[in-house]
């Protein structure tokens, strides 16, 4: 695979730098940018893909909704990024049944581009303080768990994906595979 330019949007989550390091260690050109960066400045970077990091609250997502609505390249939302994507397209989020971080067994419902090779079950590290509770109309449900019905999703037409879990942490099995699957989507787009 050729080297791609992946922009990591900093939503002030504790694992943002781990996302950046993982992407870099997988031989991609990567840069962390503030979530207040203009769409124009992001496009000036000529990225092949965008990753929306996790973060503490929806009130601190800056311009992320504008990125999702107006930038036509592959986007992967992680945790809060996943929730933001859902809200942007009319889905709902709410408090999860299991707050805090824990190892979760995820069932892959549909092994699409982003979850290729991860199913039928995979162990992940996730926080469920908040989660997607209602899937947006234009999205396909990809994965679930006993503590969260919507662990992963993707847009029906656009290359927009969301996962509730953290593929960048060592506690997640096959996290690098998920990133490589996303890079393949970026390369093919």
UniProtKB/Swiss-Prot annotation:
Enzyme class, one word?
ligase
Q: Name one GO molecular function term.
A: GMP synthase activity
Its cellular-component GO annotations read:
cytosol
Pfam families on file: GATase (PF00117)
Its pathway is: Purine metabolism; GMP biosynthesis; GMP from XMP (L-Gln route): step 1/1
Under PANTHER family, the record lists: GMP SYNTHASE [GLUTAMINE-HYDROLYZING], GMP SYNTHASE-RELATED
What subunit structure does UniProt give?
Answer: Heterodimer composed of a glutamine amidotransferase subunit (A) and a GMP-binding subunit (B).
What is the protein name given in its UniProt record? GMP synthase [glutamine-hydrolyzing] subunit A
Specify the species: Methanococcoides burtonii (strain DSM 6242 / NBRC 107633 / OCM 468 / ACE-M)
Its gene? guaAA
């Amino acid at each position: 695979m050729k080297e791609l330019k992946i922009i990591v949007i900093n939503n002030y989550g504790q694992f943002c730098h781990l996302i950046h390091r993982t992407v870099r260690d997988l031989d991609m050109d990567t840069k962390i940018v503030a979530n207040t960066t203009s769409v124009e400045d992001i496009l000036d970077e000529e990225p092949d893909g965008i990753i929306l990091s996790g973060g503490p609250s929806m009130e601190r997502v800056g311009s992320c909704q504008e990125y999702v609505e107006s930038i036509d390249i592959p986007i992967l939302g992680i945790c809060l990024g996943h929730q933001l994507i859902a809200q942007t397209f009319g889905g709902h989020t709410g408090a999860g049944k299991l707050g805090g971080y824990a190892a979760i067994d995820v069932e892959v419902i549909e092994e699409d581009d982003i979850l290729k090779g991860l199913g039928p079950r995979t162990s992940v590290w996730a926080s469920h303080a908040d989660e997607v509770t209602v899937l947006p109309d234009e999205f396909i449900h990809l994965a679930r768990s006993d503590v969260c019905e919507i662990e992963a999703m993707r847009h029906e037409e656009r290359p927009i994906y969301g996962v509730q879990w953290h593929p960048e942490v060592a506690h997640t099995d096959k996290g690098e595979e998920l990133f490589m699957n996303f890079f393949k989507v970026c390369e093919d787009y």
